[in-house]
Amino acid sequence: MGCTVSAEDKAAAERSKMIDKNLREDGEKAAREVKLLLLGAGESGKSTIVKQMKIIHEDGYSEEKCRQYRAVVYSNTIQSIMAIVKAMGNLQIDFADPSRADDARQLFALSCTAEEQGVLPDDLSGVIRRLWADHGVQACFGRSREYQLNDSAAYYLNDLERIAQSDYIPTQQDVLRTRVKTTGIVETHFTFKDLHFKMFDVGGQRSERKKWIHCFEGVTAIIFCVALSAYDLVLAEDEEMNRMHESMKLFDSICNNKWFTDTSIILFLNKKDLFEEKITHSPLTICFPEYTGANKYDEAASYIQSKFEDLNKRKDTKEIYTHFTCATDTKNVQFVFDAVTDVIIKNNLKDCGLF
């Protein structure tokens, strides 16, 4: 009888050991799994960050994949010049050369078919080149804060000669600059520093926000993107609302949400390159009338940083990790993401009682 009991005890002890081992392994596996939620208003650079993860932590974009972006590059280029030409009418800006009016008519006549077919024919690229060189068009481009224009407009239009070549294959940088509105949730997986990342990019336009909700559970960290350069712009979906104010409103609701009490919040103040360019001629008082500092990058950027960090109502227990970023600069994103990962590792160890 004694032997039987001890054999059963032994088996039970083995089972218990196995369960403990499995639980420990599951715990370690869970600690290595990182769920990152990318949040922010529309056009703040979230999708560009996702593309950078593909370049930095995966194999980037193959030639075949880059080829597939040709139609998007063409569409972004055509849409940009059309937006500028349309705005000339609203802003009452004339072409410097009156014959450009014919080119404008040609642009609207040719663009629809070109976009549908995903091509940039010679006659259309010639029309775009002549329009972009016109001083009136350039004057209108200089006033782009008064209408909706893609950030990548000048990047593509200045490089039209290369883009219009018949054998054109987009570069990684061309791909990074493409703009396609994110609808729904885009999930990306990659491994870095022994951690398995699941990154969720969520559409930033207001109509998309209700889809975020079920992504929130069990999130390790939130990366909140803000377009620094949007301080003098209004929303595409609400012409009354300043984009920076909208961003602050959204950040406030995320940062102080009861669901995220234990979630690391990482703030990416993005598009620092565009902000640095813009701040010298477009004052920060457009967005913050109370601002009395200089319209210089360092001072103005610090002011915006403090405006966001001051929204944190739990400063004693919750830290905001802020980084200034340029999402189209791979080296910058690589450096910043390295620092972000260290914060995540440190916080994970804290949660496990190992730090």
UniProtKB/Swiss-Prot annotation:
Chain residues carrying a lipid of type N-myristoyl glycine: 2
Classification via CDD domains: G-alpha (cd00066)
Binding site for GTP: 40-47, 176-182, 201-205, 270-273, 327
SUPFAM superfamilies xrefs: P-loop containing nucleoside triphosphate hydrolases (SSF52540), Transducin (alpha subunit), insertion domain (SSF47895)
InterPro entries: Gprotein_alpha_I (IPR001408), Gprotein_alpha_su (IPR001019), GproteinA_insert (IPR011025), P-loop_NTPase (IPR027417)
SMART domains to which the protein is assigned, alphabetical: G_alpha
Homology family: Belongs to the G-alpha family. G(i/o/t/z) subfamily.
Name of the protein this chain belongs to: Guanine nucleotide-binding protein G(i) subunit alpha-2
